[in-house]
Amino acid sequence: MAEQTEKPEWWDQAKKELSEADPVMAQIIRANPEGFLATRGNPFETLLRSVIGQQISVKAAANIWERFAKACKEIKPEIITRKHRRTLRTAGLSERKIEYVFDICRFFLENPDAADGFQHRSNEEVIKELCTIKGVGPWTAEMFLIFALRRPDVAPMLDYGFIKAVGQAYFPEIAFEEWSAADRKEEMSSVIAKWGPWRSLNNGPMQY
């Protein structure tokens, strides 16, 4: 898959329909007229970035990735698997994340056609297969669907940034820290129901 720097073919239709269905989204779309969901075009790299970025800040993840990429020279599974663990630890990876990185490498080495194959499979099928890899759970699989495959209908309900952004946009009167899990689930579900098949549009400019 080549890097896709042009907006998805469904993007303009999604913006139009969301603007008509949801006044809050209409305002967000007007405020961000040029943005769109981009992808690096490299599913292997996207999955690695998602795992390396788990449970740390965006800034910390970017710094670790920069050191990791420099240590590996090329982001290819056959190259990364030959690196000594000490090299990856020096780049900032924990022992657990090193295990995850190696397991992702093994998956792509054993399934060389996986990247193209994912394009023709349902969201549920992709999530199920990705979750067989160590370190890949539902959150990481959903990030992959959004940022690698650019699927339009993914609402990452486990993503802190997504939840907080929805809260700030739709429920500004509620302090995020006081938003109970039960209320959050109910209120977010009512918001997301308005988005129809375009739930990925609200995932902001971040790129994995």
How would you label these PLM feature ranges?
Residues 11, 32-34, 50, 69-70, ...:
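A short, structure-level motif marking secondary-structure boundaries and short turns
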Residues 34, 53, 57-61, 70-74:
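Short helix-loop boundary/capping segments at the starts of domains
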Residues 43-51, 84-87:
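Glycine-/proline-rich flexible loop or hinge segments
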Residues 13, 17, 63-66, 70, ...:
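Intrinsically disordered, compositionally biased low-complexity regions
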Residues 49-64, 90-96, 202:
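A short secondary-structure junction motif
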Residues 1-43, 194:
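Intrinsically disordered, low-complexity, charged terminal extensions of DNA damage-control enzymes
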Residues 68-208:
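Catalytic cores of DNA base-excision repair glycosylases
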